[in-house]
Swiss-Prot record:
It is found in: Cell junction, Desmosome; Cell membrane; Cytoplasm. Pfam families: CADH_Y-type_LIR, Cadherin. Keywords: Calcium, Cell adhesion, Cell junction, Cell membrane, Cleavage on pair of basic residues, Cytoplasm, Glycoprotein, Membrane, Metal-binding, Repeat, Signal, Transmembrane, Transmembrane helix. Its main location: other. The keyword Glycoprotein applies. Three calcium ions are usually bound at the interface of each cadherin domain and rigidify the connections, imparting a strong curvature to the full-length ectodomain. GO terms for molecular function: calcium ion binding. This is Desmoglein-2.1. A component of desmosome cell-cell junctions which are required for positive regulation of cellular adhesion. Involved in the interaction of plaque proteins and intermediate filaments mediating cell-cell adhesion. Required for embryogenesis, specifically for progression of epiboly and normal convergence-extension movements during gastrulation. It is a single-pass type I membrane protein.
Amino acid sequence: MARRISPVVAFLLCFGLSHFFEAEARLQHSVALHRQKREWIVPPQILEENVDYTKKDFIAKIRSDKEVAHMKYLRYSLRGVGADQEPFNLFVVNPETGYVRITGILDRESISQYNLSGIALFTDGSIAENDIGLRIKVKDQNDNAPVFGVMNPGAVDELSAVGTEVMRLNCFDADEPGNPNSQIKYEIVDQQPAGQSMFTVENNRRVVVANPNLDRETVDQYVLLVKASDLNGAPGGNAATGTVTIKINDVNDNVPTLGGPYEASIEENTEKVEVMRLKVSDLHLKGTDNWEGDCYIASGNEAGYFSIHMDPKTNEAVLMLDKAVDYEDVKDLNLGIGVANKAPFHPSVSGGSQGATISFGGSGGGAGSGAAGGAGAMGGASGSGGGTGASSWSSSGVPLYNVNIKVKNQPEGPKFFPGTKAIPISEGKAFDSTEIIARYPAIDTDTGKEATNVKYIKSSDPDNWLTIDEKTGAIRMNKAPDRESKYLVNGTYYAKVLSITQDLPSKTATGTIAIQVEDFNDHCPTLISNVQTLCTDKDAVLVTAKDEDAPPNGAPFDFNIVSEGTAGKWTVEYMNDTTAIFRTHEKLWPGPHELMVEVTDQQGLKCPEPQKLQVDVCTCKNQGGCDRTATGDAKKGSRLGPAGIGLLLLALLALLLIPLLLLLCTCGMTGAFTDMPFETKVHLISSNTEGQGEDRDVPLMCPPSNVDGMGFMTKDYMAVGAMHSAGLGLGVGAGVGAAGFLESTSTMGGRGYNEMELDYMNSIGRNNAYSSRDMAGDFDGMALSDGYLCEYYSQKSRVVDGFGKDDPMVYDYEGKGSPVGSVGCCSLLEDQNDLEFLNDLGPKFTTLADICGGKKTEIPAPAPAPLPPPPKPVVDRSEVVSSTTNILNTGNIATNRVNTVNVASNMATASSTRVENVLVTDNRPTMITSVHPAPTLLVQPQPMYYMVEQQPSTVLVAERPAMTQGMYVLNSGPVAEGMVVQGGNIAANTLTRGERMVLVFRGGPAQALNNGMLHTSNLSGSQLLLVDGGATSGQVLQGTIQRGVAGSQGLMFVDGQGGQVIQGSINNGISTHGGSQNVFYVENKGGSSVVQGGLQMGKASTAGSLIGDVGIGGSSVKITQNPSSHKVVVQERKVVTTQSVK
């Protein structure tokens, strides 16, 4: 809130400001000049012109007060127009007294006011005071009369409305403006030619039209005498007169006329000739657009016989015949000729019903003028011998003149009718050259009968099909008709015939013969429209017909009006081949009129009954459209009103509301999964919390194999150290060690999660690995299939039921192994040579044998061999090392006694893999040489459990974690299958992709495997060779493991004796798809090299994984990369120790 200023403070502020300004004023006053008062002795007066003021002593007096104040004498003078300027010395001043007087007579028209300056000087010439202004105004007298200047002639259009400005007068008064002396009043005192006053003059000098009946054709120029009086016409004023000329401009207010009546004649079959000339008469100014005529044919020329054009020099209409007229068709023609001007008509022209129109009478009466024009028309009607004049008016108010044209008949020669003769013939009809197929005589056009004094010849016959009788015109076939003839045009053969008269000069007519091989004239011509509209001021309608048949069975048509059922009198004229002009000769009242019409085609075919044509006569508008309201035929219609528009808008809004409601509905749905804010890694584990499934019998089935470009493949994947993480079980000891692994793969959100189980000596080890690779290409169509569920529940049932007491326990470190020799990894093997368990496999194995072999096979149980003493452990530790290495560049890994190993792995790109399992058991020297392949039985997979009885000595085949069930093959079928061998000699065979071989034996010859046992030079996939035995010595494997394309190959060898294990090499060619090769060697005793040869690998497209080689017993071990993890699996009755490997 603003604070109020106290009165004391306000007073002090005002007092200070007033003293400040007073001091400043005093300071300025001390330096400024003092102003002296001046005095006008006699004020100036108004002087009237033409008055003599020279006799007066003075008219004004000037004096300065300096003269009294300083007691000095001053001298006065004048300056300005009338003093020291032209006119000189009209005003003079006494230099001593300051009296001003005039020396002449003033004239206001010359100078209306004088502005003088009085000067006061001291006697020494110095300025006594500033100049004094002296103004003398001259009063006006009415001493000047109005004066007319030069005036150009004015102009106005005839028939202009009242008040139309024509011109402005050039008249002025020299007296003072705004004074009554200069105010002028005008009036017309005379008009030539005399008559009604056509114009008037306003006080503002405007000449305007006073009468709207200006007619240039009557008077084209007016001369007016105008009087101008000042003092607004009051008495005593001055006056003057002037002459004004006004010209009347021409407008097209008169309709041009044609003389008459007009009649002409034309010759038939004549064209491009001038028929007649029609003189156009016009009252307008010659040579203008209002005068030049523009004639046109308003009616009677629907067929287009005539045309008309204007001759600009003579203003005549020239009627031309453009198309020949046939006397037999048309004998006379009545044309309606309309005439207009180039310039449009004035609005006053209204078809002769007003005074500005012209009546067209005959010779009995002339054309009236003005409003009496209508009488001229009546005079024309009653005059003797007068013509018809204008017989009708057009819809635009223009009269129509009748021109009657007679058609003269000319002697004509014969003529073929129709012009094209169609003769239908069937192609398969029997040919007879003497048979007359048709007659085509010429017609005498004058008599309408067949011509007699003529002969017929062929003019054109391309393929010589026809012969014609030269006297009768009979036509015969000269050869059989051929539908495939090249001379046919659309299935028709054309030939031309001439008819020549025998008199002099001879006349010729040409006719066309059309032989139709297939088409027939089976359609009659019909009217396109059965309803036509005719204006009351017209007398003809156009009627068009059509025919479905092709020429010559169609047009030209012949139209005929049947009198029965037809109202009124009508005639037919032809416009073209398909259209005719129906002209009435009576005045038709508005309303419907019916006509019965017959239409005949070129071959004379017409419909059985006449066709009805309805002509609706109505009053037409200026645009030519039919005004239904004038005939009383107005039809009720409907239109869209505001209410309907509003409903449409509401409907559109409702339609827009539906998508909005749908959007609101989607907002209430459950949202998408939220992304994890961290890398899940091992947090997302396969917990397998689904619980145990229902116990059911699971049949053994053979999964279907798919074939692609890479060979036999299946959807199951099981690769050793190739595609995913792999686990390995290794048995060492004097007895038989069994090893295998099981790998399962699942997908979650585009990533792969792998679980591997290792089965070694009735113990289970798990190695879970999470893979973030995109497996969309490898696992297309795999999502919890029946095979997957079967495998899953089988594992669970085996773990829960068969190995409930042998759950693995994983520890980071459990110390060193036990020094007691009796406690070892092989102390629980018991009798591994006992094959009695094969007799107790149960009905499930029998079912499997029946499916795979096709018949039951009896295998006698051999006598149990004595168990050899368990070998004494050579080392006091065993080691399980798992290492995964990603190799980006191929290189060499050197060890003391192990050759260089190059390992690379590429992701397999195949979408499917075929897997075959081979079980080879060596207990007898006998070889099964003839095993018949059994048919494959495909059964719908069902979830099942694998119930396996705990047998320490049982060797299980490593089974893949497939989406479908595996199959045991116990035969030696063709390639891509394994073999079952019992005996000492092992036959070589080729393993395809996905095949695995397990050899179990205790003795035998020195050579366990022949050369080339594992050879896949051109096949892709994975191969596994597991050799478990106790060969005393000798060469175990000789040969080469070769690889051509992508896949993985593995060799695992367990031996308890010395000797040369592997001689040869593992070769790998150029791998474009990637893969891995793994070789595992375990030796209990040193003595010879573990590996002789090398594992060679060519180029690999991507890096793979390397499993290190482990040598035991004197050999140095070098691991290319530090192990990522160490896990020791400890089971009951087994001691496993670990020790770091350097």
